[in-house]
Curated annotation (Swiss-Prot):
LRR repeats lie at residues 119-142, 143-166, 167-189, 191-212, 215-237, 240-261, 264-286, 288-310, 312-334, 336-358, 360-381, 384-406. SUPFAM superfamilies: L domain-like (SSF52058), Protein kinase-like (PK-like) (SSF56112). It comes from Arabidopsis thaliana. Residues 34-458 are extracellular. Glycans are attached at N75, N196, N225, N236, N300, N309, N336, N357, N370, N389, N408. This is Probably inactive leucine-rich repeat receptor-like protein kinase IMK2. PANTHER family: LEUCINE-RICH REPEAT RECEPTOR-LIKE PROTEIN KINASE IMK3-RELATED, PROBABLY INACTIVE LEUCINE-RICH REPEAT RECEPTOR-LIKE PROTEIN KINASE IMK2. Belongs to the protein kinase superfamily. Ser/Thr protein kinase family. The modification Phosphoserine is found at S618, S715.
Length: 836
């Protein structure tokens, strides 16, 4: 202290430093208070927002509807609080540069006053419920870089003025309700690299300026109504386009060659359009391409050999086109391929052995083509293969045991000469007692030793001998025909004498001897009269195989056609019990049930059932095995759904019978596309073990109700579940045996409806009719989901389904006309009189 008194200047120095420290602390405290006063957590440069920006934000708030209270911070306080406390607002030097309010539940509209935010760079309001139009004033914002308005309810057209934003880089207006054409001016921004306008209702052509943009790396226009040809993609130098998605539109014409010259392309999808012509071979020169989808078009020609050069390709989907020719042998060069879908084309030749070299492949679908030969053994080495389908080809031979154990029978159906894929379709045992069939090697050796040139005399003698043999064969055939005709005339004379008794017998059945073949033929009613010999000597054509047996189309000698089902041996009940059950089935008559006309018991235990022949085949083939040019309108689909429902309701209410195996394959269609339920009651003819196998097969095809895993018994409610699956099949065009994204058909439909994308459920063909039948489609979908409710008690009765379908679409005079039999005839009166 004494020292300080001695040095007064030291006192002044200490006082000065103390005051300076206090002033610095005060300034720091003041700055911190201003910066943190709003409590909004946003950084702020300390400059107050301009009055124009403040008024614009107030106008924006006024037109938005704040359902969740997120805009409470946008109060009427001074403009000094905007940048530091208002939710979703970011500023720079007193100017609003970003509005970020995604997933906030905001409704209302976007004010045109947003154009007053002259420094706005980013507008992010996606995943809300905002309606109205896209503000035209966005085109005034010269600093705008990103617009994210996807997943809202915006309508109207895309403003042309957006092309006036020179710095715009990302424009995403997807998943709205926008209409009109795509403005060609959008690509006037020299920095636009990402454009997403998918899932709207845009129409008109794809602007040439968009296709020829020098800056776009991502272009997604899927699920719109765009039409016309795809313009040439200008290629002169380096173009950065990596992703192109144009699927689910109405583009026509050929795939432009110039598109396949964008060397940086990684993903191309142009599925579900109307493209034609062939695939350009230049598409095989894209070194970075990972996914290529040309499915559901009318593309023809062959798969280019150049595709084997796509070394980065992971997924190739060419489903539902008109491609022909073989699969290139060098396909195994696609080392990264995990999915190959060539379903529903006209591709022929053998399945290449080289596919077995693609070790990473997970999904392989070659169904509904013209492949021949055996299934290559090399496919058993594909350890990652989880989805495999070669059904409905012309394959032959045994299925490799590894594949038959790993995949169910639906993967191999429709190949008549294929065997070993299920217990009901075993391969025949090898025959060790061959007839005189020489192998190529053994037949050539003797010819080398005994070969000599035939003389003219030898040739004449051989020709005369052959002619005599042919004449002798013709005489034998004529003699057999005369004998058969006389026998038939005698039988007809006998029938004429007893015709009155036959008519009075009605559906009770009339038995006749088996003729020369033996056995017993029992007729119910029907338009045709034939003998056992006529039936057994008819020209037969296999229509399909099932757990019950093999179905044939039989053409009788007089040209009439019937359907014959040969039941599998050792699966049916004893003769006495069998006849009692089959006689009861022969009495059932309804316009939507396939009528049993006769049955035959052979001398060796064979059992044949005779039905009306349905010219249009099964509903499954009608829906899934047609070409893209064959359209099925909603009127026809609803007619089929009503017919199935009526037939099932009659079985439940009038016959007290459960079908137990209702599938689209068991719904047959006549010439007028009337539905006839087949295979009802056949389980009553089977042993208990065989009937259980039938129900298990129905489950593998996706028609089995979930409660089967516990109760193991069929009921009227399990039939209604199967009916619901078939109605979903009619609505979606999808087969229930083909899982979508790992979900079965009801789960997939429910997931789409839950996301409020209900229109995505319906078959693309039906979407063209939505303006006239949109309500019918939605109401039928609700009914189908009711039928497939996991709880049996929640499902309606079959007769309730009939009533609701008739309420959804009342009958017209045309729809009420029915065709009694597949081939017409007198039987129409019988069916009409027996209808209840």
């Amino acid at each position: 202290m004494n020292h300080l008194y001695k040095n007064p200047f030291r006192i002044y120095e200490i006082s000065f430093h103390f005051c300076a420290s206090l002033l610095l602390c005060f300034l720091l405290f003041s700055a911190q208070a201003v910066a943190g006063g709003g409590g909004g957590g946003h950084s702020w440069d300390g400059i107050v927002v301009t009055q124009a920006n403040y008024q614009a934000l107030q106008a924006i708030k006024h037109e938005l509807i704040d359902f969740t209270g997120v805009l409470k911070s946008w109060n009427n306080s001074a403009s000094s609080q905007v940048c530091s406390g208002w939710a979703g607002i970011k500023c720079l030097r007193g100017q609003v540069v970003a509005i970020q309010l995604p997933w906030k539940g905001l409704g209302g509209t976007i004010s045109e006053k947003i154009g007053q935010l002259g420094s706005l760079r980013k507008l992010s309001l996606h995943n809300n419920v905002i309606a109205g139009s896209v503000p035209r004033s966005l085109g005034y914002l010269k600093s705008l870089r990103g617009v994210y308005l996807f997943n809202n309810r915006l309508s109207g057209s895309i403003p042309v003025s957006l092309g006036n934003c020179p710095l715009l880089q990302n424009l995403d207006l997807s998943s709205n309700q926008l209409t009109g054409a795509i403005p060609p001016s959008l690509t006037e921004s020299t920095r636009l690299y990402r454009l997403n306008l998918s899932f709207n209702s845009l129409s008109g052509p794809l602007p040439v300026s968009v296709a020829r943009s020098y800056t776009l790396t991502f272009l997604d226009l899927q699920h719109n109504n765009l039409s016309g040809s795809i313009p040439d993609f200008f290629v002169n130098g380096s173009h950065p386009l990596k992703t192109l998605n144009l699927d689910h539109n109405r583009f026509s014409g050929a795939v432009p060659v110039s598109l396949c010259k964008h060397s940086l392309l990684e993903e191309v999808s142009i599925s579900h359009n109307q493209l034609s012509g062939s695939i350009p071979r230049e598409c095989g020169g894209l070194p970075h391409l990972q996914s290529l989808d040309f499915s559901y078009n009318s593309i023809n020609g062959t798969i280019p050999d150049s595709f084997s050069n796509l070394s980065s390709l992971v997924s190739l989907n060419l489903e539902s086109n008109h491609l022909k020719g073989p699969i290139p042998d060098a396909i195994d060069r696609l080392h990264n391929l995990t999915e190959l879908n060539l379903k529903r084309n006209k591709i022929n030749g053998p399945i290449p052995e080289t596919i077995g070299n693609i070790s990473g492949i997970k999904k392989l679908d070659l169904s509904e083509n013209n492949f021949t030969g055996p299934i290559p053994l090399s496919l058993v080495h594909l350890a990652k293969l989880s989805s495999f389908n070669v059904s409905y080809n012309t394959l032959s031979g045994p299925v490799p045991p590894v594949l038959s154990k790993k995949f169910n029978s639906s993967s191999f159906l429709g190949n008549i000469q294929l065997c070993g894929y299920s217990s009901s379709n075993p391969c025949p045992a090898p025959d060790h007692h061959h007839p005189l069939t020489l192998s190529p090697t053994s037949s050539q050796e003797p010819r080398k030793h005994h070969h000599r040139k035939l003389s003219v005399k030898d040739v004449i003698l051989i020709a005369i001998g052959a002619l005599l043999a042919i004449l002798l064969l013709l005489c034998c055939i004529l003699l057999c025909c005369l004998i058969k005709k006389r026998a038939a005339l005698k039988q007809k004379d006998g029938k004429d004498k007893t015709s009155e008794k036959t008519v009075s017998a009605g559906v009770a059945g009339t038995a006749s001897a088996g003729g020369e073949m033996g056995g017993k033929l029992v007729h119910f009613d029907g338009p045709f009269v034939f003998t056992a010999d006529d039936l057994l000597c008819a020209t037969a054509e296999i229509m399909g195989k099932s757990t019950y047996g093999t179905a044939y189309k039989a053409t009788l000698e007089d040209g009439n056609e019937v359907a014959v089902k040969r039941l599998r041996e050792k699966t049916t009940k004893g003769v006495k019990e069998f006849e009692g059950e089959v006689t009861a089935l022969g009495k059932i008559r309804h316009q939507n049930l396939l009528a049993l006309r006769a049955y035959y018991l052979g001398p060796k235990g064979e059992k044949l059932l005779v039905f009306d022949y349905m010219s249009k085949g099964s509903l499954s083939a009608f829906l899934h095995a047609r070409g893209p040019e064959t359209l099925i309108p909603w009127e026809t689909r609803m007619k089929i759904a009503k017919g199935i429902s009526r037939g099932l309701a009659h079985l439940h209410s009038n016959e007290n019978m459960i079908h137990e195996n209702l599938t689209a394959s068991n719904i047959l269609l006549d010439e007028q596309t009337n539905a006839h339920i087949a295979d009802y009651g056949l389980s009553r003819l089977m042993t208990a073990a065989a009937a259980t196998n039938v129900i298990a097969t129905a489950g593998t095809l996706g028609y089995r109700a979930p409660e089967f895993s516990k109760i193991k018994n069929a009921s009227a409610k399990t039939d209604v579940y199967s009916l619901g699956i078939i109605i979903l099949e009619l609505l979606t065009g999808k087969s229930p045996g083909e899982p979508t994204n790992g979900m079965d058909l009801p789960q997939w439909v429910a997931s789409i409806v839950k996301e409020e994308w209900t229109n995505e459920v319906f078959d693309l063909e039906l979407m063209r009719e939505t303006q006239s039948v949109g309500d019918e489609l939605l109401n039928t979908l609700k009914l189908a989901l009711h039928c497939v409710d996991p709880s049996p008690a929640a499902r309606p009765e079959a007769n309730q389904v009939v009533e609701q379908l008739e309420e959804i679409r009342p009958e017209t005079e045309v729809e009420t006309e029915t065709t009694p039999f597949g081939s017409g005839g007198e039987g129409g009166k019988d069916l009409g009189s027996n209808e209840e």
